[in-house]
Amino acid sequence: MERGMESEAFYGLSARGWDGSEVSLGSFRGCVIMIANVASSCKFAESNYKSFAGLLDKFYRKGLRILLFPCNQYLGQESRPIEEIRGEVSKKYSDRFVVFDKVDVFGKGAHPVFRHLVNTKNGKGRLGNFIKWNFTKFLVDRKGCVVKRFGPSDIVKEDDENLLRSIEDGENGMQNS
């Protein structure tokens, strides 16, 4: 998919927020975005949530936004109500997370956000466009293009070159800060 088309397709997507409101990804135009499918009972939860909170502490003012999409498809590891999930991650890790309603990330019912992400050039993983587990992460630049896909056990660090390049690129022109 051509970058301009990828960008417009991304910003044209929306998802239901934890409170039931429809949230347009276009509202994050100009921000660097990390999108992850999450599950609180997953063995990767603690390390990823701590990493995300640290990234927000360092880069929130520079336009980083982390969008969490709870998913119960993998061994039922996110079976709690969405209000509980949001409450826990907000209290224990960061109140800056953007938490969405539960979604499916694979199969016929896969949410359009994840269908889009896995079908971009940089959104494919080792298994092609299949998301193999919780905490698969997608880094999206300020133009709405997927820069990198991280696996469930990959902990995104503050010095990750793709993250730093995305943060630095266009920082002065960012919106939604």
UniProtKB/Swiss-Prot annotation:
Pfam families: GSHPx
Cellular localisation: Cytoplasm
Single biological process term from Gene Ontology: response to oxidative stress
Domain of life of the source: Eukaryota
Entry EC number(s): 1.11.1.12
Disulfide bond annotation, renumbered to this chain: none
Catalytic activity: a hydroperoxy polyunsaturated fatty acid + 2 glutathione = a hydroxy polyunsaturated fatty acid + glutathione disulfide + H2O
Assigned GO CC terms: cytoplasm
Enzyme class: oxidoreductase
Family matches, as PROSITE patterns: GLUTATHIONE_PEROXID_3
Active-site residues, Swiss-Prot/TrEMBL: 42
Gene Ontology terms for molecular function: phospholipid-hydroperoxide glutathione peroxidase activity
Keywords: Cytoplasm, Oxidoreductase, Peroxidase, Stress response
InterPro entries linked to this entry: Glutathione_peroxidase (IPR000889), Thioredoxin-like_sf (IPR036249)
Family label: Belongs to the glutathione peroxidase family.
Protein purpose: Protects cells and enzymes from oxidative damage, by catalyzing the reduction of hydrogen peroxide, lipid peroxides and organic hydroperoxide, by glutathione.
Protein known as: Probable phospholipid hydroperoxide glutathione peroxidase
Upper classification of the organism: Eukaryota, Fungi, Fungi incertae sedis, Microsporidia, Unikaryonidae
